[in-house]
Amino acid sequence: MARRIRVPLGFLFAVAYIWLAQPTKTSLIAGTLVLVPGLVLRGLASGHVQKDEQLTTSGPYAYTRNPLYLGSLMLAAGFAIAARSWWIVAVMLLMFAAIYIPVIAGEERSLGQKFPGYDDYARHVPRILPRLTPYGNQDGAYSSALYWQHREYQAGIGCVAMLAVLLIKLVAKLVW
C-alpha cells in the first residue's frame, strides 16, 4: 500500500511545499549544499544496482543497504532547509516514517528470499546510515547505461525545477 500512495502523495506534498515555503538566500544555499550530495548518491547508486538480477553490494551499496533512500532523505532534508518551514520538516519526517520505512522493510524481506547472500550482507551493512569502510569486494563498476535505464536523471530535473520555483518565490517576495 505504501508503495502505491508514494507518488500521488508526493505531488500533493509538492503543492503544499510550494505554498508553505519561505525561502531566503541563505536557506536556498544551505539546502542546496545538502541536497546536491543526495542527488549524487542517488545517481551513483542507480548506476550500480541491477534490480532483481543480482544482489548489489558495490559502490554505495558497500556502505549502506539503501543508498537510494538515503539519497532521497538527503534531498528531502535539503528541500526542508531551503523552504525554511518547520511544518515542511515535520511532514517530511512523517512521510518518510509512514511510507519509506515500510517499503524498505518489504524490499528487504523480498531480497532476503531472492538472494542467498543477503542475510550476511544485512548483518554487516547498515540499513540507512552508512558504515565507514566498504563491505566485501568491489567487483561491480558504475554503469552510466544503468543510470539512464533507471531514469535517475529525472531526479536532477525535478530538483532543478523545484529550486527554480523557490528562487522565483524568493525574488517575487523581494520585488513586491
Identify the residue ranges that each predicted region occupies.
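Membrane-anchoring alpha-helices and their flanking helix-loop junctions
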Residues: 1-61, 70-176
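Short, conserved phosphate/pyrophosphate- and ester-handling motifs at nucleotide-, phospho-/glycolipid
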Residues: 66
